[in-house]
């Protein structure tokens, strides 16, 4: 599979760029310390800014890898870093998912966007704008034929974001937090063929 790595992406309101250790103060203050933001995610709120700093320093070492995708979501009008969005191979953390996608090519893994933004930016369409841009980036810069996406059953708002980006519901599955807690999820797929049909010049 041809990968593209984490390159800058710009939308009308947002800049998606690599996260840096210097982003730690805004990441911690705007979303990483908030239990409401992390409620349906795999990780728990950061205890202090040192934890955020340590994570960002570790991520910085991964950016040279072309199969590593992790962006800061920056509000262009203010310069605020208020969230993150990534694409990751969910088979690495959830190997049982291999049995949940009959008919899909899993030879290169199950590549899945994940995102979270600070509460102050909820309800403004920012996540939808970022996810749409990420999907476009993926299909233009890699040769992957599909993307997966999932959300906790109890977090239907995230499903609305996925559907606005073209994802189609496929099945329910159980994912897990890093501490092993099971989270019932709804899983979606977006194929290259369907994506291109949505954005063909004749539409």
Q: Which role fits each region the language model picked out?
A:
Residues 1-26, 30-36, 72-203:
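Acyl-donor (CoA/ACP) binding surface of acyl/acetyltransferases
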Residues 36, 46, 65-68, 147:
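Secondary-structure boundary/capping residues
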Residues 57-72, 83:
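A short helix-loop-beta-strand connector motif used in the catalytic cores of GNAT acetyltransferases and
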